[in-house]
């Protein structure tokens, strides 16, 4: 059944005397309660951190620009700065150094280098957008070029670097496909024999490679697990810890603001069936951009994504099919006069939704940037229509073909709403040209969107089956291609792997748009991995997300 289009004619809210049967999900409650509401920001402490950062920041800048530093040490320094989440502070200086070093690259210079050094150099270039050739790893393969040399397995740090490097591979880079499988197998066999910080480094990488992790969490773990690497330059470690504590205060204040807003909106009272996940949603948005200048953007995007949670859970876990049709029509109309046609329990949400968007549009119109709000609103309407289509399929027992499922599933993944809402508060960088580029649906965006859909499906399909929800991508793939459940999951994982390669390609220079605009696209794919790699971390946040929220917002970094 085709998605319902925008309609100017209101549907009728016909009341039934019988109490409707509702697909209530009984989601677990919030594990945080009002913990983050009690935070009180002391701006003087933030100012102290900001002032304390100036000296080590200047010391790190001088190190990056040091003309006497050996090129391999310079690349190691840049890699460490990047892993610690400090790149944005020194972007011009770092790019100037990498431009020069990349032009000077000569494969012969790598012949005598060890695996660890080559891996660090490779990652430093690739993470910052420079396509260093993967041929630098050829020397570690046997003469027949079919397998890697067993001798390198004794260099655990080098193997770890090889594994992390392989996550940056592109399509056609077969040596890195082989490197990923080889290094992962060997590291898994060695991890229980390791001790100290190296054991922690390997465990963390096998759990989730840096490239697929949440930047703020990865930075925090790096200066905890890589003290030796950071200690080469005391100023870097000092800056990283001060930076983390500064950001933590800012972000705890943002979390308090959205938590208070959520409480004031009374969604848990008017729509008590929904998932109460304010810290989790804020964490998700923080994963898109952690830099101080995006504070307003995080608050706006968190609020819009919380609206999305209410909508999703209403469609999935409470509303009847008749109510879903009425609500979809009202969202298509986007007019307060449509409120009378929808059930009373969802009217407060509908009014708040319209009011918040109207206020956003009014604010950004003053700056000439209202189009980003309009794009977010239209994406919200699209997802409502997509949710309706899923509900119609569930209601009729229809299992869509895989291509049909994906066409609608990419919409209902919520990717489009979140990615466009993330742009709303980013400021002048979101120009008309940037919005046109987003609307053109470039390859990197398609790849990130696909990961968002399929990673979710692979992890949640059994839970959705048990709840009697619409078929996921796993079910549709099984039906369409007549394969087993295992084969279907393996094929979807291959699609996810290939999508990561396309994202990696899209982040390399020359880029279609600035990395500031590409970062949320890359980071949305990363956050999907964080939330859904091992379980449905959003519905059941007691594991990974609780760990991450505790790490970032409960307790500062010891100096």
UniProtKB/Swiss-Prot annotation:
Enzymatic class: lyase
Pfam families, alphabetized: Terpene_synth, Terpene_synth_C
GO MF term set: germacrene-A synthase activity; magnesium ion binding; oxidoreductase activity
GO biological process, one term: sesquiterpene biosynthetic process
Domain of life: Eukaryota
Residue numbers binding Mg(2+) 2: 312, 316
Tissue: Mainly expressed in sunflower trichomes.
Similarity comment: Belongs to the terpene synthase family.
Protein task: Sesquiterpene synthase involved in germacrene A biosynthesis. Germacrene A is a precursor of several sesquiterpene lactones.
Protein name, per record: Germacrene A synthase 1
